[in-house]
């Protein structure tokens, strides 16, 4: 199962790499944290893409690097959960781009999060994050707070 950068994975001290990534991320060193992760396996590639998407949300820069990392993660995803997690990140990056006025990608955000909902089972660990992001899109892009509660 792929863990995104938002999962808090690695904060227990069990994995030195994840601890280093978490520490860098908590200091807003997203590119440095992403550079530690190998881009040749599905879970680390997805975590790398999530870190770079988070950087875009907070700094409004690095969009191309985040897109490249996301394409890599999508290409490496094999299982439905991995593909769903990659679609969730694609939706979140599209949401961030729309929110910051970089480009209107609201339709892409909704479509990607819908794909993710079809691929990620309700009991999966990544489902709560997906539902939260669907609520963000409903509330902030569609302007329908009631739909956010349903998501």
Regions found by a protein language model. Give the residues of each.
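Actinobacteria-biased recognition of intrinsically disordered, low-complexity terminal regions
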Residues: 1-31
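Residue signature of alpha-solenoid helical repeat architecture, marking inter-repeat boundaries
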Residues: 11, 43-46, 81-88, 125-127
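"A position-specific structural signal for the A-helix of alpha-solenoid helical repeats
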Residues: 15, 19, 47-54, 89, ...
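Amphipathic alpha-helical repeat scaffolds
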Residues: 18-22, 34, 50, 74, ...
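Short coil/turn connectors between adjacent alpha-helices in alpha-solenoid helical repeat scaffolds
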Residues: 21-24, 53-68, 94-110, 138-149
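Short, charge-rich amphipathic alpha-helical segments embedded
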Residues: 36-59
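Conserved binding/catalytic microenvironments
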Residues: 92, 98, 115-118, 122-151
């Amino acid at each position: 199962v792929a863990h995104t950068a938002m999962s808090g994975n690695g904060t227990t001290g069990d994995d030195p790499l994840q601890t280093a990534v978490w520490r860098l991320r908590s200091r807003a060193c997203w590119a440095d944290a992403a550079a530690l992760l190998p881009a040749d396996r599905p879970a680390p590639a997805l975590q790398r893409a999530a870190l770079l998407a988070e950087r875009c949300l907070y700094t409004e820069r690095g969009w191309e690097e985040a897109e490249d990392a996301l394409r890599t993660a999508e290409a490496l995803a094999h299982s439905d959960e991995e593909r769903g997690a990659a679609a969730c990140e694609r939706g979140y990056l599209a949401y961030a781009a729309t929110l910051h006025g970089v480009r209107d990608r609201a339709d892409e955000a909704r479509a990607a999060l819908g794909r993710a909902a079809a691929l990620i089972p309700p009991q999966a660990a990544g489902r709560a994050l997906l539902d939260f992001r669907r609520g963000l899109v409903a509330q902030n892009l569609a302007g329908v707070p009631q739909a956010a509660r349903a998501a």
